[in-house]
Amino acid sequence: MKLFLLAAAAFSAPALTVSELNHIKSLNPRWKAGIPKRFEGLTKDEISSLLMPVSFLKRDRAAVPRGTVSATQAPDSFDFREEYPHCIPEVVDQGGCGSCWAFSSVASVGDRRCFAGLDKKAVKYSPQYVVSCDRGDMACDGGWLPSVWRFLTKTGTTTDECVPYQSGSTGARGTCPTKCADGSDLPHLYKATKAVDYGLDAPAIMKALATGGPLQTAFTVYSDFMYYESGVYQHTYGRVEGGHAVDMVGYGTDDDGVDYWIIKNSWGPDWGEDGYFRIIRMTNECGIEEQVIGGFFEN
């Protein structure tokens, strides 16, 4: 019984601790560490539910065609939030479901459609439709970037207004909907005409961002990342916790000359820099430059 109670206490204990935070701070990382409001009191299992197994990050070089960009140099910096403020919706929260792969893919769909002028303002596309209907991926247990873009080119997705997100509270895939939540018929499904991969070529990634808009990427999450509050993240301490897919929206250089990528996360605005984070650029930090995929759209 005593062992059972100890195990139960460990199971329900907060995952982020002051002692671990102090250890990270003692290593003097270039970024600011703390216990984000988003994670206060959450257990390890609750935080782990936000991630997917690192096996989903394995790169299939044949799955998505290589992207090409013009030979002209990319601008020194680019921030989609500043250049196209009418195109980017608020930061959302995926809840207790490892659906980051769906959130980041449809975020990129919306961003890039608006960048191309197909949408005149920010439109939230439905991660729930992708989670429920994309049988090539694993719903709340994770997804492969090439696989979700295969789905988005063959099937597409609808708007979040039509099929709002539910898996964050249920933790389940749900049934692929045939009608909108209000009972009306599903409207036009928005498909990508193609998707290309700019991975492992930082200059090409920069040019693709500046000329086509945000891209979907993924990276390995270490335990110190959960303590991120602000600054340019670089892995400092801890073990692998899982994989995570995100929306890359820009790049720049800080006052100390450190190059970084700007990333939109899906853990709500109470994490990081109002829901965003920056991570070291040009060194494939945590695999962030490994798979970087952009979709293209015509209507």
Swiss-Prot record:
EC number of this enzyme: 3.4.22.-
Domain of life: Eukaryota
Active-site feature positions: 100, 244, 265
Signal peptide extent: 1-19
Cysteine-cysteine disulfides: 87-114, 97-140, 133-176
Keyword Hydrolase: yes
GO molecular function: cysteine-type peptidase activity
Coiled-coil features, chain-numbered ranges: none
Keyword terms: Disulfide bond, Hydrolase, Protease, Signal, Thiol protease, Vacuole, Zymogen
Gene3D superfamilies on file: Cysteine proteinases (3.90.70.10)
One GO CC term on file: vacuole
Predominant location category: other
PANTHER family, alphabetized: CYSTEINE PROTEASE FAMILY C1-RELATED
Role according to the record: Thiol protease which is required for parasite excystation and invasion of the proximal small intestine of the human host.
Similarity remark: Belongs to the peptidase C1 family.
Protein name: Cathepsin B-like CP3
Organism whose genome encodes this protein: Giardia intestinalis (Giardia lamblia)
Protein's gene: CP3
